[in-house]
Amino acid sequence: MIISAASDYRAAAQRILPPFLFHYMDGGAYSEYTLRRNVEDLSEVALRQRILKNMSDLSLETTLFNEKLSMPVALAPVGLCGMYARRGEVQAAKAADTHGIPFTLSTVSVCPIEEVAPAIKRPMWFQLYVLRDRGFMRNALERAKAAGCSTLVFTVDMPTPGARYRDAHSGMSGPNAAMRRYLQAVTHPQWAWDVGLNGRPHDLGNISAYLGKPTGLEDYIGWLGNNFDPSISWKDLEWIRDFWDGPMVIKGILDPEDARDAVRFGADGIVVSNHGGRQLDGVLSSARALPAIADAVKGDIAILADSGIRNGLDVVRMIALGADTVLLGRAFLYALATAGQAGVANLLNLIEKEMKVAMTLTGAKSISEITQDSLVQGLGKELPAALAPMAKGNAA
């Protein structure tokens, strides 16, 4: 199979993975309206093509939280990576490390912090959920600090799990789920050999270490469902801010006022995100939410964004809309499921090449030159102010 884009990896992953795993990563909440809009809205962002700009010295390098990145991309925290490829978190982290970008380890990873951190040279980021069990949260933070994690990504948009209909149909949940998953596994031999037999233990490594016993998929579903905390407020985050020495990023911001609250709280960064359309269906896509948030807090706090990014052109679009850096989620997971570390490495190379093409043809020699002026129109509606006079002149 020829691989030229993330969409090719998606098609390959669908063939390789048991349906319960493919649809768990591919699906969204309710009717998946927001999931679709994440991709569609971003594709509507039109860029200004510029010519004769001497683009021979183009650079994708940027700096975030005093870390040098080869391009403004990091791998997002994704649960259960180790179920998509053998010791998947380690493989993805190695690919990111080699490319010179951060890898973010999820709270609900298969591989524990202590397995992933020593496998790479660059300090990884660690993602933490708001959970009822504050003892677990403190334990996870202590272990992340001990392992040298540089940045904490604190996910706040899951006070309760979203309603994901695909999971019930695919076997991730619903009646006879365990038996359905077993039957799917044995009929997908590549996955069964790579992960089912040789990817063990299939624990939730960070949780198992705390509970002192093995944990499997049923524990993942049950433990998380019982531990999300709907009572959380900014006040509850203060002890985490005091405990964590490094940069702290609040993930799950869609409203400008929440972004301002994050600045007042003292966060170092925010992630404009709707959890990949997996939480509340019908909310704004990240691409639509981003410009207003950037208007509110740009320059006061680092702005990251995720949800709907599938290629290097999408990265450039998100930066033009106001992001400093983006997080890749599903895109890298498709590649990981298809070809492990090599797949993720190839995807990152593709994204870098696509970014260079987009920047060359828009006349942006550096990441700092990708601005609102790079846009013809934001999301198919109003032109940015910088282009309004030109538009009026052309209308005549």
UniProtKB/Swiss-Prot annotation:
UniProt-listed PROSITE patterns: FMN_HYDROXY_ACID_DH_1, FMN_HYDROXY_ACID_DH_2
Residues the record lists as binding FMN: 106, 127, 155, 251, 306-330
What is the official name of this protein in its record?
A: L-lactate dehydrogenase
Q: What processes does the entry annotate via GO biological process terms?
A: aerobic respiration; lactate metabolic process
Q: Which family does the entry's similarity section mention?
A: Belongs to the FMN-dependent alpha-hydroxy acid dehydrogenase family.
GO MF entries:
FMN binding; L-lactate dehydrogenase activity
Enzyme class, one word? oxidoreductase
Q: Where is the active site?
A: H275 (proton acceptor)
> Which residues span the membrane?
none
Got a GO cellular component term for this one? plasma membrane
The coenzyme or cofactor needed here is: FMN
Q: Which gene encodes it?
A: lldD
Does Transmembrane helix appear among the keywords?
Answer: no
UniProt key word Flavoprotein: yes
